[in-house]
From Swiss-Prot:
Example GO biological process: allantoin catabolic process
GO molecular function: allantoicase activity
Family membership noted in the UniProt record: Belongs to the allantoicase family.
Keyword hit for Hydrolase: yes
Gene name in the database record: alc2
Broad EC category: hydrolase
HAMAP family: Allantoicase (MF_00813)
Species assigned in the record: Burkholderia pseudomallei (strain K96243)
UniProt keyword annotation of Hydrolase present: yes
EC number assigned by the record: 3.5.3.4
Taxonomic lineage of the native organism: Bacteria, Pseudomonadati, Pseudomonadota, Betaproteobacteria, Burkholderiales
Keywords from the UniProt entry: Hydrolase, Purine metabolism
Record's catalysed reaction(s): allantoate + H2O = (S)-ureidoglycolate + urea
Protein's name according to its UniProt entry: Probable allantoicase 2
Domain of life: Bacteria
């Protein structure tokens, strides 16, 4: 089975938005004031932090994260990170997992906008996350309310210590003026700005993974629901990156072999007003974009001629019958 979601009590932004600090998408730790005990790159590892008893290296106890030496002077340590995409940040996770006697008492995050790979010395940094008290061996979820899109972050540790993981959840910003008329764009791609509105069940894997680039690495890299023991079906609602006319749909069940859905269908609508929460009820009555279609294991299923002519839409509801796993969902369309 896919690994269960580690923290079911995590805020909604951790399931809705992409991790802009994911190195698989292009994020990079550029510079750190110190990384004596553990390199800065480990802080961005997309996998959960682990602890290996008895593992040591030339610098001491091996730790899964970024860890600086004990500071014996004034000041604090910091690390500059280039985000995978310019984006608006809605929340962060400062994770000190397995750091107990060596975590920072506090941390903050600054942000800037720069066209350069590494921000210049005169870059203007703004406070994104003010100084926040940290505790050992736990996640620290911080909401962010700042509408500006940033390209780089500076993580400050006060005064030193170790940070297991940095997650930066946000919505990428794309220059849509460069999209050619009639060009097919994946309107469900998370890197284009699409996001998950809601899903009725995400027991074995969050539905937002369906919107990630590339094919799934394994069965854990996708949306998987628990086994349904009652009538009905499972579903997920996606807000498209831009309003558009959907011309082609791809439903990928990569790595799902004994647990793929028997069938799928799609509903869609152009929504104006309301909130994400209000869409859950409305979506039950949206018109059908794609009637029920059979699915097979470990395959990309492409639908074009089967799509209804609904015109421009902003949201889609994927129904899987009755349950199971979907690795990726691609909604190729023309911008409205």
């Amino acid at each position: 089975m896919a690994a269960p979601i580690l923290d079911p009590n995590a805020p909604a932004f951790t399931r809705r938005y992409m991790n802009l600090a994911d190195p698989r998408l292009g994020a990079k730790a550029l510079f750190a004031s110190d990384e004596f005990f553990a390199p800065k790159e480990r802080m961005l590892d997309p996998e959960p932090a682990v602890f290996i008893p008895g593992k040591y290296d030339d610098h001491g106890k091996w730790m899964d994260g970024w860890e600086t030496r004990r500071k014996r002077t004034t000041g604090h340590d910091f690390c500059v990170v280039r985000l995978a995409r310019p984006g608006v940040v809605y929340g962060v996770d400062l994770d000190t997992s397995h750091f107990t006697g060596n975590f920072p008492p506090a941390a903050s995050i600054d942000a800037c906008v720069s066209d350069a790979d590494t921000p210049p010395d005169d870059a203007v940094w703004e406070t994104l996350v003010p100084a926040t008290t940290l505790a050992g061996n736990q996640h620290h979820y911080v909401d962010v309310s700042n509408p500006r899109a940033y390209t780089h972050l500076r993580v400050n540790l006060y005064p030193d210590g170790g940070l297991a993981r940095l997650r930066v959840y946000g919505q990428p910003q794309r220059d849509w003026s460069r999209a050619a008329r009639g060009e097919l764009v994946d309107l469900a791609a998370i890197e284009n700005g699409a996001y998950l509105v809601a899903a009725n069940n995400e027991h074995f894997g969050p539905a937002s993974r369906m919107l990630m680039p590339g094919r799934g690495a394994n069965m854990g890299d996708g949306w998987e629901t628990r086994r349904r023991r009652e009538p009905g079906n499972d579903w997920a609602i996606v807000a498209l990156a831009r309003p558009g006319v959907i011309r082609r749909v791809e439903v990928d069940t990569a790595h799902f072999k004994g647990n793929f859905p028997d069938r799928c269908s799609l509903q869609a609508a152009r929504v104006a007003g309301g909130t994400d929460a209000s869409l859950v009820t409305q979506a039950m009555f949206w018109p059908m974009l794609l009637g029920e279609q059979p699915l097979g294991m470990d395959s990309v299923h492409t639908f074009e001629t089967q799509l209804a002519a609904l015109g421009p839409v902003t949201h889609v509801r994927l129904n899987i019958h009755p349950d199971g796993g979907v690795s990726r969902l691609r909604l190729w369309g023309e911008l409205a």
